[in-house]
Curated annotation (Swiss-Prot):
GO terms for biological process: double-strand break repair via homologous recombination. The gene is rexB. One of its GO terms (molecular function) is hydrolase activity, acting on acid anhydrides. It holds the Pfam family PDDEXK_1. Keywords: ATP-binding, DNA damage, DNA repair, DNA-binding, Exonuclease, Helicase, Hydrolase, Nuclease, Nucleotide-binding. Heterodimer of AddA and RexB. The keyword Iron does not apply. Belongs to the helicase family. AddB/RexB type 2 subfamily. It comes from Streptococcus pneumoniae serotype 19F (strain G54). Its EC number is 3.1.-.-. The keyword Hydrolase applies. Its cofactor is Mg(2+). It is an enzyme of class 3 (hydrolase). This is ATP-dependent helicase/deoxyribonuclease subunit B. Despite having helicase-like domains, this subunit does not have helicase activity.
Length: 1091
């Protein structure tokens, strides 16, 4: 056993490589052992340090891989499971346990998070050389019982299936202990680099090999001052010094100091000594000069994006200044990898800097995982429509074109069907020939055939199920689709997809191993496959060696690269405080460690935090050979953050904090990094002028479009793809002639008028271009309204010999049997329930009709308007016709006055502000149309709400009071002629604000005609502004702004071109109500008509 240590500015790898070469010269086979996170880089570093640049006698590897290079004899043939296979084994065993048998974990026994934690605990106990029976020492009885039961069942299952338990290292330990290694130990040597602690398992291997006479060399970084100090607690080198002291004591071997004498103390050595002195409470006088501050820079940036841009610009500048440099000379360290991952790709692609982030990617969000998840959902939830749509949207199932998938989705949404039997029926329903049923049925068979075959599978052996799954993948064209999708991708992306497919196949292989010979149902198989894929990870290797390597800062080793940029070093990220998220608490770990024998040790993360983090900081400060940049943003993940206390210490020693900002106000040579970055800087430069004009924080793309749009305008050019603000063009004369020929009548409906005043462009989309809403066969608000209308129409048309209740029930029965409504409301149990609710509404609304002796109904569903009678005449002599349908016309028995009724599914009232602004013209239009048809005597126009009144019992003292309050809401709401109001009963809400004199009535009709005239003139002129109305002057209601994706109108940017509703100009600021409010609006109407 040979122990070495060196100062942190001397390469430990160089020293240990020389030791390895000497051992090779003596005829030894050397295993150069590095930690898992550093083995790839360490191999390259060792090769660079070798005098011959290569050696067949030195193998750079990890502890876990050593067994591959040793000859193991007479070991039983067992299949080894990785984490995926182990996860499947846990899933299988937990599925077989009754939830009642598990007191703590019963309710979540198949939760992926629990399975992941059980796998981690399984590995931890293996590494710590602890038996599962040691869990008997847990004090929590319920947890102890559960964990013992789970691990006993899993262990028994693994033994029964001849599946290897434990790690590769535990198998090597077992082989050495049982003398099953035929390799000559005298010819083997271990050189161990980069460790500051061994796991119990790793220490056991070292101990066994040392006992077999294997020569072992272990090196670590430590200062002589720290190693020889009698007190190491809190020291920067505490982790490595305690590690060396433990080994020196155990093997009775003093550690040798291999530190080199440096001609001059560099900036990083100076920083290290100052930090060490600060933590061991010794005094040290060192001056930090300008050169040191240049070599070790501390940046303070505003945002993470700015940090990355500054790093990219710095790398580009250094490459430009020094042609000998390449990307591999740079290293980027991240305080939090997840927070920087997306921005990193965006900005480094923009600056054309190749990089490699050595991080495994989870398969959980890959389309292949979503594909399996969708099939599982189809099976588990009995073929829901949404699950089938999700399956098709993965673009992996069947080779259908996107247009075919869209057509199929649109049709099944129209049908609203769920369940396999419904999909198996031939598609026959269409909407006025809109759907190509022949093509849709071909698509239906193509989509269903592979799924039907797969879902017909019963519980069977795993091998047979895998064969059926393989057939399904071929018939469903999944492999073909994956292949086609990857052919169009770049080489790097193709490699990623290849790794994903390998991971997918590996999950299937592990399933075959774990469930060999077992009976498995299809649903269990899909659930296991999805669970395995959710746990799976994949990674790619860099396409070229010359890339900027990016990694988490806590994985860094000293003297890694010439230039190192460490970003995101906020208080939350540096130091990283390891949290215990396992199934065992720190207290339980401590108790288990005390109860078990020596050499058996579970890691307690909280006890390692301090020494680990200080050693990490030391490695970070010494990670660069030439220049180090440490940066912290003021805003991290959109919240305020402070820089790390370690950075503040460096500033205290004399290093300077530099406020770094991206300066877009001027362009300099630093912007000449690459074509894309220069373009970005130019846009940002021009953006400054735009920002000072608008003072709005806009995104890059929007600013770019506005800048380019402005430049094109100055040169008299136009690019319709990038408008500076949403605008529409006036329709051409020939287009208008085709749409509205002079000899053809021009019709405008009351709903069209309302749409026009909501947003002129919405009228253009719906009534000119004919944009339609997605069709639905299932009952909706429209079909509900038609159903209720038909019931009342029929009830009021039946002879009066029978009572109203009998007529209503007869109308309900006859209407329910109509083919149209029978098809809709017998479709499903949900539709039947909806029908029962609607019938209750009909019976409740009938209460008003039953007890209203003052009126009689003379017409139902009465049409008005047509070619015979023009509604208004335009200034150019052209007539505008209005046609529509009135739900009901009533007549007062007393004097024959006419009233108009419109049924509504919710409470609707006539509002003067909305009427004045063109948003409530329905009732005045009905009255005007009937007047033009010869009617002169009116008592009003009103809405009748068809709904069951809801009354809070808390607001009334008795049930009788609730009935009274409910009946108050069941009234006709609308406009009534003052002279006829005395004839109207209690069912009419005839307060003063709703009553009109003859002069007000005529004024109402005149202003309504004026609204139609203004709208018709604009429509016939082909002018449709993008001007959704705003009621409060701050936002646009969602039902007004339904076509945002088409118009591009955004309220927070384009509110200036919205239509602000006209309001009363109240000089004294008083709020008017009732009749005074009505009079104020009529005064405003008079002013508008007199202009």
């Amino acid at each position: 056993m040979k122990l070495l240590y060196t100062d942190i500015r001397t390469s430990l790898t160089e020293i240990l490589t020389r030791e390895a070469e000497e051992l090779v010269a003596a005829g030894k086979r050397v295993f150069y052992i590095a930690p898992n996170s550093l083995s790839f880089e360490k191999e390259r570093a060792v090769l660079e340090c070798l005098s011959q640049q290569a050696s067949f006698s030195i193998t750079v590897t990890r502890f876990a891989q050593m067994a591959r290079y040793l000859v193991l004899n007479d070991l039983p043939v067992k299949t080894t499971l990785d984490d995926i296979g182990l996860g499947l084994a846990f899933y299988k065993c937990l599925a077989e346990l009754d939830p009642k048998d598990l007191r703590v974990y019963g309710a979540i026994k198949q939760d992926p998070q629990l399975i992941q934690q059980l796998i981690e605990l399984y590995h931890e106990m293996t590494k710590s050389q602890m038996s599962f029976l040691d869990l008997e020492n847990l004090t929590d009885e319920d947890k102890r019982t559960d964990l013992l039961l789970i691990f006993e069942k899993v262990t028994a299952y693994l033994n029964q299936g001849q599946l290897a338990q434990g790690s590769q290292l535990s198998h090597l330990i077992e082989a050495i202990e049982n003398d099953k290694v035929s390799s000559d130990f005298n010819q083997i040597t271990l050189v161990i680099d980069g460790f500051t602690r061994f796991s119990a398992e790793e220490e056991r291997v070292v101990d066994l090999l040392h006992g077999k006479g294997v020569e072992i060399v272990i090196g670590a970084y430590a200062s002589k001052k720290a190693y020889t100090s009698p007190f190491s607690e809190g020291n920067l080198y505490q982790a490595s010094v305690k590690f060396l002291h433990h080994l020196a004591s155990k093997y009775q071997t003093p550690a040798q100091d291999c530190s080199q004498t440096h001609e001059k103390m560099d900036s990083f050595d100076k920083a290290s000594r100052l930090l060490e002195s600060s933590y061991d409470f010794s005094e040290l006088a060192l001056d930090v000069d300008e050169k040191d501050r240049e070599n070790l820079q501390i940046w303070s940036c505003l945002t993470q994006k700015e940090e990355l841009e500054l790093v990219a610009r710095s790398i580009r500048q250094k490459l430009h200044e020094n042609s000998d440099l390449s990307y591999k000379h740079f290293r980027i360290l991240l305080g939090d990898v997840a927070s920087y991952q997306l921005s990193l790709k965006t900005i480094f692609d923009q600056y054309q800097i190749p990089f490699y982030l050595g991080r495994s990617e989870a398969m959980a969000h890959h389309p292949l995982t979503q594909f399996v998840e969708s099939i599982l959902a189809l099976k588990r939830y009995r073929f829901r429509q949404e699950d089938l749509i999700n399956l098709l949207r993965t673009d992996l199932y069947t080779d259908l074109s996107q247009s075919d998938i869209d057509a199929f989705e649109q049709y099944i949404r129209y049908l609203g069907i769920n369940g396999l039997p419904a999909f198996q029926q031939i598609f026959t329903k269409s909407h006025h020939g809109k759907f190509n049923l022949e093509r849709l049925n071909v698509l239906r068979l193509r989509i269903l055939a592979p799924l039907e075959t797969l879902f017909a599978s019963r519980k069977q052996k795993a091998e047979n199920l895998l064969q059926k799954w393989s057939v399904f993948l071929k018939e469903g064209a999944v492999t073909k689709q994956l292949q086609d999708l990857t052919t169009t991708l770049e080489a790097v992306e193709q490699e990623r997809q290849a790794e994903v497919w390998k991971a997918f196949c590996h999950v299937l292989e592990q399933f075959a191993t774990v469930f060999a010979g077992s009976q498995v149902s299809l649903e269990d198989f899909l659930a296991l496959l999805h669970s395995g894929m959710s746990l799976s990870q994949y990674r790619t290797i860099p396409a070229t060696v010359d890339t900027v390597l990016v990694q988490s800062y806590d994985l860094i080793a000293p003297l890694t690269a010439d230039f190192v940029y460490a970003i995101g070093l906020t208080q939350d990220n540096l130091p990283k405080i390891s949290q215990n998220t396992s199934l065992l608490t720190d207290e339980e770990r401590q108790n288990l460690n005390q109860a078990t024998e020596e050499g058996v040790q579970l890691l307690i993360a909280s006890s390692e935090n301090l020494k680990k983090n200080r050693y990490t900081m030391l490695s970070l400060v010494n990670s660069a050979r030439k220049q180090l940049f440490l940066s912290a943003p003021s805003l991290f993940n959109e919240s305020e953050s402070k820089e790390s206390a370690y950075l503040q210490e460096l500033i205290h020693f004399g290093f300077r904090r530099r406020e770094k900002r991206m300066n877009h106000k001027g362009l300099s040579k630093e912007d000449m990094g690459s074509y894309h970055s220069l373009l970005s800087s130019l846009v940002a430069y021009h953006q400054q002028g735009e920002m000072s004009d608008t003072e709005q924080d806009l995104t890059f793309v929007k600013v770019l479009s506005r800048v380019i749009g402005k430049k094109l305008d100055l040169q008299g050019l136009e690019n319709p793809a990038i408008p500076t603000s949403p605008s529409s063009k006036t329709l051409a004369k020939d287009t208008l002639q085709a749409l509205y020929p002079a000899k053809q009548e021009f019709y405008l409906s009351t709903s069209g008028l309302t749409e026009f005043y909501r947003n002129e462009y919405s009228y253009f989309l719906r009534y000119v271009l004919g944009l339609q809403e997605e069709l639905r066969l299932r009952p909706d608000a429209r079909s509900h309204g038609n159903f209720l209308h038909r019931i009342f129409e029929r009830a009021l048309q039946l002879p009066n010999e029978d009572s109203f209740d009998q007529r209503l029930e007869q109308a309900i029965q006859e209407t329910s049997q109509e083919r149209e409504f029978e098809a809709i409301y017998q479709e499903s149990l949900e539709a039947q329930f909806t029908k029962e609710v609607l019938l209750d509404v009909a019976r409740t609304t009938g209460h008003i009709l039953r007890h209203n002796p003052a009126i009689e109904t003379i017409k139902e569903e009465a049409n008005f308007g047509g070619k015979d009678q023009a509604f208004i005449q335009l200034d150019n002599g052209r007539s505008v016709f209005v046609r529509g349908k009135v739900d009901r016309i009533d007549r007062l028995k007393a004097n024959g006055a006419i009233g108009v009724v419109d049924y509504k599914s919710s409470l609707t009232q006539f509002q003067f502000p909305h009427f004045f602004n063109g948003l409530n013209s329905q009732l005045p239009t009905y009255l005007a149309a009937l007047k033009r048809e010869g009617e002169q005597n009116f008592f009003g126009a009103m809405y009748l709400e068809m709904a069951e009144p809801v009354q809070s019992l808390m607001a009334v003292k008795s049930l009788a009071g609730a009935v009274v309050e409910a009946s108050k809401s069941m009234k006709y709401q609308g406009l009534f002629l003052e002279k006829e109001s005395s004839y109207l009963g209690e069912f009419y809400n005839k307060n003063k604000a709703n009553q009109l004199t003859d002069e007000e009535f005529q004024l109402l009709l005149d202003y309504n005609a004026y609204l139609y005239k203004k709208a018709a003139e604009k429509i016939l002129a082909g002018r449709f502004a993008i001007n959704p109305y705003t009621e409060n002057g701050r936002s646009i209601a969602p039902y007004v702004q339904q076509h945002q994706a088409i118009t591009g109108f955004e309220a927070n940017y384009h509110l200036g071109q919205a239509r602000f509703l006209e309001k009363l100009d109240l000089a004294d600021g008083k709020r008017l109500v009732g009749e005074k409010l009505k009079q104020a609006w009529f005064e405003k109407i008079r002013e508008e008509l007199n202009r």
